[in-house]
Regions:
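Membrane-interface helix/helix-cap signal primarily in integral membrane proteins
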Residues: 1-100, 403-404, 424-425, 431-440, ...
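Membrane-interface amphipathic/re-entrant loop segments adjacent to transmembrane helices
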Residues: 36-50, 57, 91, 95, ...
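Divalent metal-coordination and catalytic microenvironments
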Residues: 77, 105, 146, 196, ...
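Conserved beta-strand hairpin/beta-sheet module of binuclear metal-dependent hydrolase folds
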Residues: 268-271, 365-444, 449, 546-572
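Binuclear metal-dependent hydrolase catalytic cores
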Residues: 370, 398, 407-411, 421-519, ...
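Active-site-proximal loop/helix segments of hydrolase catalytic cores
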Residues: 374, 394-404, 434-441, 455-471, ...
C-alpha cells in the first residue's frame, strides 16, 4: 500500500513527513508482511555509487569484529555507520554532549581532503592535479558516508578552499560558509528548517567566529585552542538546543576537552585502517584489536560524563524568538569585540541574551490543569499536570508484535481468537516508545520530574515505555494494581522502582493523588479485596492471570473545580457495570476504555458518566480493528465530541476549572464548536462547562 509518511503526533515531535520530504521521499510503500517482499535482483544502482558503497561495506566489516558496542562506535566515528549502536550508549553520548562524535562532520571531511593533498604532493603532482585529487577524494568520501547537512557543508567549504588554492587566492571563511549555505539551500530549500542544518552551520560559525575571541591563557597552546574551539561551538548552538530540547549539558565542555584529542588521533589512524581494509582485509583484521583500548576509553568517558552532575540541565520552554534574540547579539559580538572599550559591554550583553533565551515569558491568567493523551500508537500514555505544577504519568505506551501475524485489514481469519488463546506469541516491539515518544513529549511539555507514575495494568501496550521513563525522570511514587505479570517490561519496571528507591503503592479505591490548587486524581477501581475475590472465584493461583489483568485495571477520576475526567484503562463491560453500581459521577471527559474495543464503553457507562468529550488512544491500522464501529456509533449517538490519537495525534485538554480548551497536534481545520457542550477545539477561547 502506498501512503503518506507519518507526521509528528506529539508535542515537540519532529514532523517526520517533512523530514523525509527534505530527503526527497514523499510516500512510503508499506507491505503487509515479511513474505510480501522478494528480492529479485541486486546491485542495480548507478555504477559509481554502487562501487563506492560496496567499498564502504568492505571496510566496515573488519571494524565490527570489535566487541559490542565498540566496533559500531568506531564505524560511526570514521564513516557515520552508527546503525546498531545500543540506545543506552547513544543516549550516554548525547547527555555528555558527545553525540557529534558518532556522526561524520567537517573533521573527517577535512582530514580526507588534507590526506589526499599530502599524498598527491608526495607524488610530485602539480597544484591543479593535487587539487583535483583532493576534490575527488572529498566527493567519494561524502558519497560513502551520506550527504548529511554537516557533510555537505564541509564538502562545499573544502572545494571552495581547494579552488582558492588552485587560483592562488586567499580563503575567506565567511564567504565560504555563506556560499556553502546558499548552494545547499539551492539544492534543498526545505533544509533551512532542518535542525541538523541549523546546528551544523551554527557550530561552524562558532568555531570560526567566536573561538578566536575565547582563547584562554593556557599551556600547552594546543589545549588553549581546543578549549576555545569547544566553547565557541557550544555557545553558538546553545540557543538552538535550548529551543529544541529545553535542556543543555554542562558536562559537554570537560567531556569534549578529554575526548576530542583522542578522536583527533583515532580518526586519521582509523582512516589508514579503512584503506588497508579495502586493499588487504586480512592484515587490517590483525590491526583492528589495537583500536579497542582508545574506543573503550571514549565510550566509558561518555558514560561517566552522562552520569555526572549537570549532564542534563533542564530549562523552561524557550520560544524561538528568544533564541533569535540571542543569535542577534552573538552575531554582533565579533564586530563589537574589535572596539576594545566595549569588550565588557559585549560580554554582559551576550550573557544577558543567552540568559534571556533560557527564561520563559510568564503566562498570564489563572492556573490551569493539563490532561494530555499522547500519541503512542496502539497503547496508552496520559500526562496529568496540576495547576500547582505536579505531574502524574498514567501508563507509558508500548508497541506489541504478534509473531508473524499480519496487521490491519490483512490479518488472517481467526487471528484474534488465536491471540486471545495465547496461540500467537506476544512480544515487546523493538521500538522503544518511551525513549522515542513519551520522554520527548514530556520534555516539551515542561516536565522535569514525575510526582507519580500510575500503571493501570501490566500489558505491553501500557507498560512498554515505562522502563525508559523511570530511568530518565525522578519519580516520587509508583502505583499499580498489584497483579503479577510475566511481561519483561513490567519486570524491568519493578526492578527500577527498587533500584531508584521509588515508593511503591498498590492502588486501591479511595487512594488520592494531590495535584495542587485543589486538583486531584482519585482511584475508583479496583476496590479493596477485588483481586483476592476474583482469584477465589476463578480458582486462579497467585501468579499471572490474563482475565484479571484487564479486570483489575486502575480507573482514575480527575477533578479540578468543575473540570472532571474519567480514565478507564482497559476495563471491560463487567468492570464498567461494577463501577456504575458503586456510583459514578458525571465526567466532562472520558478516556475510552481498551482503545475503543467493543467489549467496553457500554450504554450503561455512557448514561452514568454523560461525557461531553471522549478521547480514544489507538494506533493507526492496528491489528484489532480498534476503535470498533459500534463504540464510535454509541459515542456519536450520545452527542460526544470524539478525538482519536491515530487521526488527531496527541489530544491536549487544558482547564482553568471553569472552561476547557481542546487542542490536537494534527490540527483540525478551523474551530469546531459543540453547541451547548462547553468545548471549543483548536481555539484560543473556551466556553463555560456548566454542570455536566
Amino acid at each position: 500500500r502506498l501512503e503518506l509518511p507519518p507526521d509528528g503526533g506529539n508535542p515537540g515531535e519532529p514532523n517526520r513527513r517533512l523530514a523525509l520530504r527534505r530527503r526527497g521521499v514523499v510516500a512510503v510503500l508499506r507491505a503487509s508482511g515479511g513474505t510480501a517482499l522478494r528480492i529479485v535482483r541486486r546491485g542495480e544502482g548507478r555504477a559509481p555509487v554502487r562501487w563506492i558503497l560496496a567499498w564502504r561495506d568492505r571496510i566496515v566489516r573488519p571494524l565490527l569484529a570489535l566487541p559490542e558496542p565498540y566496533g559500531r562506535v568506531l564505524a560511526g566515528l570514521l564513516l557515520g555507520a552508527s546503525v546498531g549502536i545500543p540506545p543506552e550508549v547513544e543516549e550516554a553520548f548525547q547527555r555528555a554532549g558527545l553525540l557529534h562524535v558518532l556522526v561524520v562532520s567537517g573533521t573527517q571531511v577535512g582530514l580526507v581532503g588534507a590526506a589526499a593533498l599530502a599524498v598527491a604532493g608526495a607524488m610530485r603532482l602539480g597544484v591543479t592535479a593535487r587539487v583535483a585529487v583532493a576534490a575527488l577524494a572529498v566527493l567519494v568520501f561524502a558519497t560513502m558516508v551520506g550527504w548529511s547537512a554537516s557533510v555537505g557543508r564541509a564538502a562545499v567549504m573544502a572545494w571552495l578552499a581547494l579552488a582558492a588554492l588552485a587560483l592562488r587566492r586567499q580563503t575567506d571563511w565567511p564567504s565560504a560558509l555563506a556560499a556553502a549555505a546558499l548552494i545547499w539551500l539551492a539544492a534543498s530549500p526545505q533544509a533551512l528548517f532542518s535542525l541538523s542544518f541549523q546546528l551544523s552551520f551554527a557550530a561552524t560559525w562558532g568555531l570560526l567566529a567566536l573561538a578566536p575571541l575565547l582563547t584562554l591563557p593556557l599551556r600547552p597552546r594546543w589545549l588553549a585552542h581546543l578549549a576555545a574551539a569547544t566553547l565557541g561551538a557550544q555557545v553558538a548552538v546553545l540557543p538552538l538546543l535550548a529551543a529544541a530540547f529545553q535542556w543543555v549539558s554542562l558536562a559537554a565542555f570537560p567531556a569534549n576537552l578529554l575526548v576530542l584529542p583522542m578522536v583527533t588521533v583515532l580518526v586519521p589512524a582509523g582512516f589508514a585502517l579503512t584503506v588497508l581494509a579495502g586493499l588487504l582485509p586480512p592484515l587490517a583484521a590483525l590491526l583492528v584489536p589495537a583500536f579497542l583500548p582508545p574506543v573503550w576509553l571514549v565510550v566509558h568517558l561518555a558514560r561517566f560524563f552522562a552520569r555526572a552532575p549537570g549532564s542534563e540541565v533542564w530549562l523552561p520552554p524557550v520560544a524561538w524568538w528568544q533564541a533569535a534574540l540571542a543569535y542577534a547579539v552573538l552575531l554582533a559580538v565579533p564586530a563589537l569585540h574589535r572596539a576594545r572599550p566595549l569588550r565588557p559591554i559585549v560580554a554582559v550583553a551576550g550573557a544577558a541574551a543567552l540568559l534571556l533565551g533560557a527564561v520563559p515569558v510568564p503566562a498570564a491568567g489563572p492556573p490551569t490543569m493539563l490532561l494530555a493523551v499522547l500519541d503512542v500508537g496502539q497503547g496508552d500514555a496520559i500526562l496529568l499536570r496540576g495547576p500547582g505544577g505536579r505531574s502524574v504519568l498514567v501508563d507509558g505506551g508500548g508497541e506489541v508484535e504478534y509473531g508473524d501475524a499480519q496487521r490491519g485489514a490483512d490479518a488472517p481469519p481467526g487471528l484474534m481468537d488465536r491471540v486471545a488463546a495465547n496461540a500467537v506469541p506476544v512480544t515487546a516491539s523493538r521500538f522503544d516508545v518511551g525513549r522515542r515518544r513519551v520522554i520527548p513529549a514530556l520534555r516539551h511539555l515542561g516536565v522535569r520530574r514525575l510526582d507519580a507514575v500510575v500503571l493501570t495494568h501490566a500489558h505491553e501496550d501500557h507498560v512498554g515505555g515505562l522502563p525508559a521513563v523511570l530511568a530518565h525522570f525522578p519519580v516520587g511514587v509508583f502505583l499499580d494494581p498489584g497483579v503479577p505479570h510475566p511481561s519483561p517490561s513490567y519486570v524491568r519496571v519493578l526492578d527500577l522502582v527498587r533500584e531508584r528507591r521509588v515508593a511503591y503503592v498498590t492502588a486501591r479505591r479511595g487512594h488520592r493523588l494531590l495535584l495542587g490548587e485543589g486538583a486531584e486524581a482519585e482511584v475508583l477501581w479496583p476496590p479493596a479485596g477485588f483481586v483476592e475475590q476474583h482469584r477465589s472465584a476463578t480458582g486462579a493461583g497467585p501468579g499471572a492471570d490474563e482475565d484479571l489483568t484487564n479486570a483489575a485495571s486502575v480507573v482514575l477520576q480527575v477533578r479540578f473545580a468543575a473540570f472532571t475526567a474519567l480514565l478507564t484503562g482497559d476495563i471491560e463491560a463487567e468492570t464498567e457495570e461494577a463501577l456504575v453500581r458503586l456510583g459514578l459521577v458525571p465526567s466532562l471527559v472520558l478516556k475510552v476504555a481498551h482503545h475503543g474495543s467493543r467489549t467496553s464503553t457500554t450504554p450503561g457507562l455512557l448514561t452514568a458518566v454523560r461525557p461531553r468529550v471522549a478521547v480514544i488512544s489507538v494506533g493507526a491500522d492496528n491489528l484489532f480493528g480498534h476503535p470498533h464501529p459500534s463504540v464510535v456509533r454509541r459515542l456519536e449517538d450520545a452527542g460526544v465530541a470524539t478525538y482519536r490519537t491515530d487521526l488527531d495525534g496527541a489530544v491536549l485538554l487544558r482547564s482553568d476549572g471553569a472552561r476547557v480548551w481542546v487542542g490536537t497536534v494534527r490540527r483540525r481545520a478551523g474551530c469546531v464548536r459543540y453547541t451547548g457542550r462547553g468545548v471549543c477545539a483548536g481555539s484560543s477561547t473556551g466556553s463555560r462547562m456548566g454542570s455536566p
